[in-house]
């Protein structure tokens, strides 16, 4: 591992020395590809044994969504977690052997949301130190990451945490690159760009792919892509997670400074100690999770608005709804009656491919 770390340090130093311009873009692209490969070795060490990615650190996923809290010590993370869970929790705090504490599951707008403290991520974890690797395996399964910062010293810490997560292949508040990539048996590298490219040319693309021993592939660039974008697509193990920056301790700054913070994207200022602005934070969490609540209506009865079936926004068809309740339900499915925003008239008879919207009411009719 130490030789891998030494190689990483060497490449990072060379990248820092290299001026960024058209002439060096090709060389930098190569260095970035080498760096990505070395980082992957650290995260998934060779040998295959060793208990897998989450050795001794397996946190059962409960509820409808999972939020990971990341932050340096003494930024008020524990206070925020316990106050949020204390105010909005229906479940007592519970502990995991190697995780400090998990304050539990909060219930918000009918959804159960699991809160996880992710310790040790930011202490050189991406370099394989400590238990960082196991923690990251859990972080990658989160639906949302909250980076908790001290409002009096946010910027330096923000960058360190972002770099640490980036090093693990976690991409915050970004979408997967719009790049088509398909390996083939022969024919060399075939590059197509549907729009002008400011960084990638045929030579750079070929050299990055050669670093991965790929000499035959079709590559389609559908947006102005960077070397990092191409590497992310080739690596294929990146996760794209929304992130909110929680700026704590606003009781120690002026109103003018608070106004400036409100203009920063993806930010919510709070005081964990005084429980200030928790409503704003919860509302933003809800917006970023994009959960879809579906209410059930048994035949001849009123809809049950107390316990919705909660679906992730990427899987909201009637079939997804049935699978969430029980996998046998889809076998007995005849059609569904739906009331709500997803239909033109109430109720409307729909099939299993119909896409539901938040707060729709559904009645399943069996064969």
Swiss-Prot record:
Residues modified as Phosphothreonine: 100
A molecular function GO annotation: GTP binding
Gene3D superfamilies hit by this protein: 3.10.20.30, 6.10.140.1070
Impact after mutating residue 22 to A: Impairs JMJD7-mediated hydroxylation
Residue ranges crossing the lipid bilayer per the database entry: none
Residues reported in the UniProt entry to bind GTP: 71-78, 117-121, 248-251
Activity regulation behaviour: The GTPase activity is enhanced by potassium ions as well as by DFRP1 binding.
pH dependence: Optimum pH is 8-9.
Record region (Required for interaction with STK16): 2-16
Result of changing residue 100 to D: Reduces the GTPase activity
Upregulation: By androgens.
Reported modifications of this chain: Sumoylated by UBE2I in response to MEKK1-mediated stimuli. Phosphorylated at Thr-100 by STK16.
Entry comment describing in which tissues the protein is expressed: High levels in skeletal muscle, heart, and kidney. Intermediate levels in liver, placenta and brain. Low levels in colon, thymus, spleen, small intestine, lung and leukocytes.
Compartments where located: Nucleus; Cytoplasm
Protein name listed in UniProt: Developmentally-regulated GTP-binding protein 1
Organism encoding this protein: Homo sapiens
């Amino acid at each position: 591992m130490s030789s891998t770390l030494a190689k990483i340090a060497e490449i990072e130093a060379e990248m820092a020395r290299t001026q960024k311009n058209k002439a060096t873009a090709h060389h930098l692209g190569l260095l970035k590809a080498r760096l990505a490969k070395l980082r992957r070795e650290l995260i998934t060490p060779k040998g295959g044994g060793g208990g897998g990615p989450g050795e001794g650190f397996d946190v059962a996923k409960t509820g409808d969504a999972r939020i990971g809290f990341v932050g340096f010590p003494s930024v008020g993370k524990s206070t925020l977690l316990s106050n949020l869970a204390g105010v909005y929790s229906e479940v007592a705090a519970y502990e995991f052997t190697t995780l400090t504490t998990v304050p539990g599951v909060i219930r918000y707008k009918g959804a159960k949301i699991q809160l996880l403290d992710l310790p040790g991520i930011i202490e050189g974890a991406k370099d394989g130190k400590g238990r960082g690797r196991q923690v990251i395996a859990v972080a990658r399964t989160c639906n949302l990451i909250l980076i908790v910062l001290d409002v009096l010293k946010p910027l330096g810490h923000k960058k360190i945490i972002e770099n640490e997560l980036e090093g693990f292949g976690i991409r915050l508040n970004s979408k997967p690159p719009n790049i088509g990539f398909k390996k083939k048996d022969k024919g060399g590298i075939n590059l197509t760009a549907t729009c002008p490219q400011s960084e990638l040319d045929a030579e750079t693309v070929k050299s990055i792919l050669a670093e991965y021993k790929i000499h035959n592939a079709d590559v389609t660039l559908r947006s102005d892509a960077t070397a990092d974008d191409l590497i992310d697509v080739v690596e294929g193990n990146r996760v794209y997670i929304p992130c909110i920056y929680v700026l704590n301790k606003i009781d120690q700054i002026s109103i003018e400074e608070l106004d400036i913070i409100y203009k920063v994207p993806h930010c919510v200022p709070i005081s964990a100690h005084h429980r200030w602005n928790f409503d704003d934070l919860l509302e933003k969490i809800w917006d970023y999770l994009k959960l879809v609540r579906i209410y059930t209506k048994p035949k001849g009865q009123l809809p049950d608005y107390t316990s919705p079936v909660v679906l992730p926004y990427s899987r909201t068809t009637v079939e997804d709804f049935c699978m969430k309740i029980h996998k046998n339900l889809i076998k007995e499915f005849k059609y569904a009656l739906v009331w709500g925003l997803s239909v033109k008239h109430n109720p409307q008879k729909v099939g299993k491919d119909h896409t539901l919207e938040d707060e729709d009411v559904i009645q399943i009719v069996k064969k």
